[in-house]
Amino acid sequence: VLLVAPVARGSGGSYVALNLAAAFAFDETRQVILVDCNLRQPCLHQRLDVEVRNGGLVDYLEGRVDNLADVLYPSGLARLTLLPVGTRREASGDLLGHARMRGMIDSLRSVAEKVTVILDAPAANASPDTRILATMTDCCVLVAGYGRDTPAAVQSASAVLDPQRLAGVVFNRVP
């Protein structure tokens, strides 16, 4: 399970998460599940042109949907499945930190050896959600906007993550 988190809003975290998911999906032996965990500003369903009919992550976590498979949507790319946010929610920390979220990630992790789960998180410096989600993942990648996010902002964002899980920083929008 890989967490992708932008340093700040607009750094391109969702863009990098989506492109990483697509790259992993090119491996014909692997399935990829991309989870939109940005509950306040979800965008992956729009970028993949997925019509969210049955709800999504929030609906599953709040118990309105019992079967996770009901809120997993084909992305249009082979081997890439999207779990969209579904119903928007402003107060998200309690929901993402709930035991049902951890259980969901554990069940996705155990589905098969060749499943990669990528969590698209909100900005690390704008929400406690990233810190909460990072405790459930195997590794984390920060996305810094090149020429936009200062070294101090990158350092501040990386401080919310466990250094043992921080795989590195991706610089986005390099000229």
Where are these regions (language model features)?
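Conserved catalytic-core segment of NTP-binding enzymes
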Residues: 94-175
